[in-house]
């Protein structure tokens, strides 16, 4: 827990250091402030911490009370929020438009949801030796997951659909302003995050 607290504070420290070093050219300081706001929102009660809190509270609910809507809220905030922020912050600092930020936020949501669903799949299909952590814990603890609500086949298809949507969105952004239309590094990164075996 302390490591997580330390890393979160280090993110703010790094952002503040960048803010302090920003040149006073027009637009740079407001972009730094906007980037720090995104970091605070996506890490805070309307992001990761809020999602983790909802996840902890959901563990106390009877399984039938954990709906698809609640699970989506948890995954969008606990998992996807920091992926969204990492994509949005770089774009803000580069001068992206609000419309581009919304698209990147959606891409981050797709990646985060696919990552979490894949994590739920691996908890069932992998082993301690491969994954490096105990498997089967969700089932043992009667934790509702995407797989337990929707089944394995649908979950695998949803991971693929979300990853394809994310890659399509990245390609669309890469085509703008004379871009090449593909960012192979990001496509491989997204695919590796989502198809990982551990």
Please give the residue ranges for each predicted region.
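Mg2+-dependent prenyl diphosphate-binding active-site environment of isoprenoid biosynthetic enzymes
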Residues: 1-171, 179-191
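C-terminal domain/tail detector
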Residues: 192-198
